[in-house]
Amino acid sequence: MNTKMRAALTVEKRVAIALWKLATPDSYRSVGNQFGVGKSTVGAAVMQVAHAIKDLLISRVVTLGNVQVIVDGFAAMGFPNCGGAIDGTHIPILAPEHQAAEYINRKGYFSIVLQALVNHKGRFTNINVGWPGKVHDARIFRNSGLFQKLQEGTLFPDQKITVGDVEMPICILGDPANAMAHEAVHRQPGQ
C-alpha cells in the first residue's frame, strides 16, 4: 500500500528481498542496505513470501504422487511394500521472546522441528514444521496430519503383499520415535 512518504514495494522486490535473505547469511540490516529498505521491511518481506509459499505452493510441490511408483522404488532398494521413510530434524532459530524454554532441544540449542516423509528418491511427500524443539518426535507425529491420514486409511490405497501366510499393508520406514507409524498403518480405519 502506498503512503504519503513512499510507494509500496512491488511483489517482485519483496520476493527478491526474501530470496536474498533466505539464500545468504547476511543480516537483516545488510539485506536492507542492499535493497534500500529498513531491516523491519526485510523481515516483513521474508514473512510475507514465506506465507505465500506455504499457502500457494506447498500443497502443489509436496505431494504423495503415484504410490505404486514409490512402492516399486523402495522395493528395488530392498524394502518391499514401503510407502516412505520418516524422520525429524531440528532447524536452529534465535530464542523467541516468549516461552524460550520450550524451544531448547535435547542438544541444548533453540530450534523448531521439521518432520518429513520422503519417497524412494528422497523427495518430500509430506512435511510438518513448526513444533518447538523441546517436543518429542513421537508427540509431533501423533499430532500430525500424516498420522491422521494413516489412522483413517486414506494415505495409501488398500495395497497389501502376502509374506508366507501374513498379509502386510504398506509400511513406513522410521526410527523408534516414529514407531507409532507402524501401528497407524496397520490399524484398520474405524478401529
Protein language model features and the residues they cover:
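Short, amphipathic alpha-helical "recognition" segments used to contact nucleic acids or chromatin
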Residues: 11-24
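Catalytic micro-motifs at enzyme active sites that drive phosphoryl/nucleotidyl and oxygen chemistry
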Residues: 4-6, 18-19, 101-105
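Short, Lys/Arg-enriched anionic-surface-contact patches
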Residues: 1-13
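Short, well-ordered secondary-structure "scaffold" segments embedded in the functional core
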Residues: 27-191
